Amino acid sequence: MTSLQSNVDSVSANYEEQQKNEITAIPSYGLKLKFDHVWPEKRNQNLRPSLRQTLPLVPLACRYAAYYWKVSRENRRCYMDYYYMENGKQMYGVPLGGIGGGTIGRGFAGEFCRFQMRPGMYEYNVVHANQFIVTIKDAKGCTIFQSLLSRSSSRSKQPLNTWHSNIDDSKCTYTGLYPRAWTEYDLTAYGVRLICRQISPVIPHDYKDSCVPCAVFVWSVENVCAEERKVSITFTFKNGTGTKKQDAEGGAEAVLITQGNMKGVGIRQKIAGMPCSYNLGCRVLPEISITRCTQFDPCGTGEQLWAELRENGQLNEKHCDEPLKTKDLGVALCAQVALKQNTSHDLEFVLAWDMPHIEFPKKHKTYTRYYTKYFDASGECGPKICEYALKYYNNWEKLIDAWQRPILNDDGLPDWYKSAIFNQLYFISDGGTIWLTCESSFGKELSFDDPRKAYGRFGYLEGHEYRMYNTYDVHFYASSALSHLWPNLQVSLQYDFRDAIDVDLLDTRKMLYDGKILPRHTKNCVPHDLGDPDEEPFTLINCYNIHDVNHWKDLNTKFVLQVYRDYYVLNELAQAQADNASKFSSIEFIDKDSLYEMYTQDNKRKNSADEKQQNRKSASLYINETNGKVYLMDAMAYLKAMYPACKAIMERSIEYDKDNDGLIENTKMPDQTYDTWVMEGPSAYCAGLWLAALQTMSVMATLLDQPNDCLRYQDILDKGKHSLEEKLWNGRYYIFDVHHKDTIMADQLCGHWYLKTCGFDYEIYPKENVRSALKQVYDNNVMSFQDGTLGAVNGFIVNAEPEKPGHVDYTTVQSEEVWPGVTFALAATMIQEGMFEEGFQTAGGLYKTLSERIGMNYETPEALYAEKHYRSIGYMRPLSIWSMQVSWERRKTLRD
């Protein structure tokens, strides 16, 4: 029995090791680059619109200049800064950190860059003091190689100029597949091969670990020569974010940290007045020697630390107090291991940051980050986070692999897509994202069954440069990712908008477009955004003051459509849980009428019978923190909570149908997401969204036993469907609007796309019309524009003589742009219709240009032009690529 048991244990251990190797292996797909990679094309934002495009915007430009001056005098930056725009750096890799606790960027060649520690505010600094350093000693103890593990650059007159990168950039290979990355260093000339595996805890359907602000670096060190090698990896880091004045004001001090089997070093400081600690940790193992330095000068030459490592391969903890020339402070953590020939070992490092409380410049309120629910808000949790990350990162990788592997192994999907679908998700964590605890909304305490009490408040920017939280007309596209991967965050966001719909904010502002003085927000309409992080988001909503968004024609309909889509997805996930419990192991579904008993028991609240009855409500969900279970929002409870707001905004939108034909009309003003591309009368875009919203309202009314509402919406819908065909269908496609009949709009089937994601079929758009319109868009907007290598141009004008080619619509800047988010949504629509080749060509041409030609990885812009330029780097809308995956999986189910 003993021998048999030994064999069983051996087989089991081998199997586990094989499984681990498969999970941690460098994937075949992802962004793959050498450190010396150079892209063939470099673009910028220095676009010069044509005279025709510029003239209508002259009054706006004058008002913007005055507004810009006013904001600058308040020591703030405009939420959309058109004078100082960032150009893409062609350097970024997978960013560090979970969701909502701040992020630190990484370059694909090893840099630490693009800090978002101040909530929603990006600092585009490359901090040279933040490095990994390798030191290799031979069997005699002589140092044979020492180098930075980042790309080489000349720094002869810069700080830390004695630190050198001696690696061969052509022999260093990066693979990025968000949220993980791998970097291979070929140091075989010195008998060593290194692989750094970077892991951030971003895990679908997980609401605990996904919020942890940290990243793990596993350095696999392999001795590939015939004699012993002693290898050290040193991790260095400085205070702050690379912004000199702010860093100097932070009052940085270093501390040694120890927690369980983790040793490390930390920096306590303030960033923009908010306490924050950086924590570097390493797993303690008998065969690893760990040494620490609590003070080196990041503004000096770096000679002392560099020479110490070269001499000893370790740090001298007794003499690590190098004098500081400035208020900047650097710390270092070194792990050394001895390797016999042909052996390997992992050195496990972690970087964690702890900024539990944040404020925005107006300082109306102090907010607490969501991760503190699982640690605490003391500001002393850095060591605990480090220990937690080192303990659980293997499990994170298992969950990430289980999520990604089915897509990576799907032979029906093109190779480029397997990189794009995951790497575009970078924006979920690195979109200026915040995830906060939430106890109130617009001054009112949340009820016990409000999902925000359990899942907090979620916000992400429209773009790194377009600094508005949860911009709703754009989130409409991007929400495909959130609703399918973190549906409870989508639900939480929707509750914020539901509350905002019911709020009047009557403080007035001048609209930059026409100079009118108008209120910030009026009741019964969906706000454009939830505020600027450089002002006071979630209180001062609608920071967008270019146009009067209280009368935009697409915001209300987009809220209604998202409500029904969320309901549909929640039901889908419930069914998936029933069919495959292991896939959603962190989810439990609650469909009880009330969870009040659970609430009072878990929180040990004592209530009288009257209080108990008064507070009893139909529950949506409740998180039981004592056992860590996570509940998914009940679909019907969600629908009930959202329906009154949906009804209110639909009644508001009905007013936009001036001629009672069942279609809302645009007003020859910028009144939808294409805010320079003016529509007049019924338009394919807004009318389509309106009819789709009517369709979903009719169904919601039926589900909630509201027959009168159902009949009302159905009557308007029937009228509108007839008008859509009569006024906007020309036999080949849906015209842009009734005054621009020759323009083919790439986004003309947006309403149909959303209905399909909600499980509808051809209730509004006849199948033959859909196929014909998609063919026209593909032939003209895609293949007749840059030969199909740049996605779909927004507008294309057909020639009056069909045999002659048409041309791009140059009416406005936006009509000649390609919007990646719209292109991905269009591709999803094609896949919905079984047009797989066309869909993947449409999206693939665009993605290959972004990743292979112009190097816009992990900073996808809002818009691209045919040549030379792009607009608004790091944008939310391209998350719509996840609607392609949803469409693919549903079509695959039909085929199977």
What is each stretch, according to the model?
Residues 4-73, 182, 187-190, 195, ...:
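Acidic/polar, glycine-enriched structural segments that form the non-catalytic walls/loops
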Residues 11-20, 80, 85-90, 94-95, ...:
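Solvent-exposed N-terminal domain segments of exported/luminal and surface proteins
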Residues 25, 118, 123-184, 489-670, ...:
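Helix-terminus loop motifs that line ligand-binding clefts
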Residues 91, 171, 203-211, 465-468, ...:
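Alpha-helix capping and helix-loop boundary segments enriched in small/acidic/polar residues
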Residues 95-111, 124-144, 177, 187-192, ...:
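Short, solvent-exposed loop/edge-beta patches enriched in aromatic
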Residues 389, 396, 400, 421, ...:
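Short amphipathic alpha-helical coiled-coil/interface segments
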Residues 414-463, 502-550, 607-608, 658-681, ...:
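Extended glycan-interaction surfaces of carbohydrate-active proteins
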Residues 472-476, 480-502, 558, 582, ...:
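Active-site core of glycosidic bond-cleaving carbohydrate-active enzymes
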